Amino acid sequence: MVKAAVLYEVGSQLVIEDVELDDPQAGEVLVKVGAAGICRSDRHFMHGDAPIALPVVLGHEGAGTVEAVGPGVTSVKPGDQVFLSFVPSCGRCKSCITGNSHLCDNHGATGPNMYDGTTRLHKGDQRIHHMGKTACFAEHAVVPET
């Protein structure tokens, strides 16, 4: 269980509560969140100015410490300090391998779930979405390696 700030409905306050966080899967990393920025984007989602799947843990700018890695993760290890961003990069396309990860051919996959279409956050049977695959308005976050 981790504490997280969950948005259940547009126009409402964030609810700070315990939620379940699954272990990282292949290509994923568990991060203990040390800091999270509050961005105008978070407010847009909260106020309904932009659509988002609910319920959701917001927060797409953060920093923390890697606590665990899933199978196949090679770029970070437990104890590493990392920055969390909602602009994911695949690390494999031409843009990524030439140092232009901000132009990633696959970055359009910034939806509310992990790359496999599931979530790592839930409360009982109710899944909770990850804003931009980061969801750093929580004590811990499971994020893609890249």
Task: Give the positions of each predicted feature.
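Glycine-rich beta-strand-centered segment in the early N-terminal region that forms part
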Residues: D22-A36, M46-I97, H102, T110
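Short Gly/Pro-enriched turn/cap motifs at secondary-structure boundaries
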Residues: E20-L21, A53-G59, I128-K133, E139
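Extreme N-terminal starter segment of soluble prokaryotic enzymes
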Residues: M1-K3
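Short loop segments at secondary-structure junctions
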Residues: V10-G11, E67-G72, T146
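NAD(P)H dinucleotide-binding glycine-rich loop of Rossmann-like/cofactor-binding domains
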Residues: R92-T146
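Short N-terminal binding/cap micro-motifs at the start of the first secondary-structure element
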Residues: S12-I16, R40-S41
